[in-house]
Design a protein with these regions (language model features):
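Alpha-helical transmembrane segments of multi-pass membrane transport proteins
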Residues: 1-441
């Protein structure tokens, strides 16, 4: 059987697995084992355990449970409420000030958790009811939280960048630094759209009828101080060359756990157990997907499917920007149906040779890939953030939540276009801080 026929068969079976509802981790592993046995015989089984183990035998992977613990500790505390209230006291007089406060809180929270669902849930629980109380339209209130939550996988530390770095052997430190400016740019685009739509609709918040005193404003600063301390501590450890990403993640996890226990007084055994349980549950899920995705990638390589696809694309002699356009469309469609972790681990090893052959920077592409994953988080049918927000505000029709996210999807697409025209937005900072790198690390 030719590699093209084998590849078509693998594609069909994989798509059937994804739409069937089978957990991605188990589905990828089963498909990999089945096709290895089918085309290479039972002798191929001896590499399954070895490949599964080697997929997890990386010190870098320690960063994943550590960053997950950061999100679990902060998410279990009233930290999101404090952060949101502090920003609101300073920004409430601006047009759309409450939405801007939410987006700013999402950006800061993203720098603490690296998780989109955690960011969306923590800020949304306080932000959505308050925006609706002050008269903001439901589509703006829910759509802005959905979009702001996606910043959790772009603004470092980002679990998405860790997965991409592992899958493509790209420096995770460079990826983290590369996500800073695009993350701030995307936050700015979200804010600009919010101000524009509020101005166009002539909306006047109920908040205009009252004022916070300067005393109340300055009293809110200590609520933000612990977040800034943790962010600066982790970033200094990471970008100052003091620690590796895994070590910096450990520092961040310890600081967030101390914040939850000492400041927010989550010192009961049951409360700490819930944090550890959530950390273990999400970490095991991600690590299992990584291990089976490595096995899936081994199957693709051993059957020469990856090489055949790369050669077929190279034979097209397409313009590199047309190639990038097609890759973005492919990733966008994948994001509609497949969770981000699975997309990254399944597609990155296949796409990276194509990207580097076309002359694109793998770090820059990691940022482009992540923004595509952000779109998938607020677009049905997967659209995890949509369902989180709908659970927070169940009386808002799901269709209205979806319509509210569409302008922010356009903002993300615009961000991708801007990064294509000005790749230095993603590459300048890592090149400036770490020196110019060529290809994977």
């Amino acid at each position: 059987m030719s590699p093209t026929t084998q590849g078509t068969l693998v594609l069909i079976v994989t798509l059937l697995m994804l739409v069937s509802g089978i957990p991605v981790a188990f589905g990828l592993g089963a498909i990999a084992i089945a096709f290895l046995v089918l085309f290479q015989g039972f002798d191929a089984l001896h590499v399954v355990a070895e490949t599964f183990w080697s997929g997890l035998d990386e010190f870098t992977l320690v960063a994943i449970p550590m960053f997950v613990m950061m999100g679990a500790a902060i998410g279990s505390s009233p930290a999101g409420k404090d952060l949101y209230e502090a920003l609101d006291r300073w920004l409430y007089r601006l047009p759309g000030g409450l939405v801007i406060s939410n987006l700013g809180a999402c950006a800061i929270f993203a720098a603490l958790t690296g998780s989109s669902p955690a960011c969306c849930a923590a800020i949304g629980k306080m932000g959505i009811p308050e925006m609706r109380r002050r008269g903001y339209p439901d589509d703006v209130a829910t759509g802005s939280i959905c979009a702001g939550g996606t910043l959790g996988i772009l603004i470092p530390p980002s679990i998405t960048f860790i997965l991409y770095g592992i899958a493509t052997e790209t420096s995770i430190g460079r990826l983290f630094i590369a996500g800073v400016l695009p993350g701030l740019m995307l936050t700015g685009l979200f804010i600009l759209w919010t101000v524009f739509i509020i101005w166009k609709r002539g909306f006047r918040s109920h908040a205009i009828d009252f004022r916070y005193s300067w005393k109340e404003k300055f009293q809110s600063i200590p609520k933000i101080a612990p977040f800034i301390f943790i962010i600066v501590g982790v970033m200094y450890a990471l970008y100052g060359g003091v620690a590796t990403p895994s070590e910096a993640a450990g520092v961040g996890a310890a600081l967030c756990l101390f914040l939850a226990i000492l400041i927010y007084r989550l010192w009961k055994v049951q409360q700490i157990w819930l944090i550890l349980r959530d950390t273990m549950r999400e970490s095991v899920m991600i690590l299992t997907i990584i291990a089976t995705a490595v096995l899936f990638g081994y199957m693709l390589t051993s059957l020469y499917l990856t090489q055949t696809l790369a050669q077929a694309i190279a034979d097209l002699h397409a313009n590199k920007w047309m190639l990038m356009f097609l890759i973005n469309i492919f990733l966008l469609v994948c994001g509609f149906f497949i969770p981000p972790a699975a997309i990254i681990l399944m597609t990155s090893p296949i796409l990276l040779p194509i990207i580097t052959a076309a002359g694109f920077d793998p770090v820059w592409f990691g940022v482009i890939l992540t923004i595509n994953m952000e779109i998938g988080l607020i677009h049905p049918p997967v659209g995890l953030n949509i369902y989180i927000v709908n659970a927070i505000a169940p009386d808002v029709p799901l269709a209205k939540v979806m319509w509210g996210t569409l302008p922010y999807v356009v903002c993300m697409m615009l961000a991708i276009v801007i990064l294509c025209f000005f790749p230095e937005i993603a590459t300048w900072l890592p090149n400036h801080l770490m020196g110019v790198a060529i290809g994977p690390k």
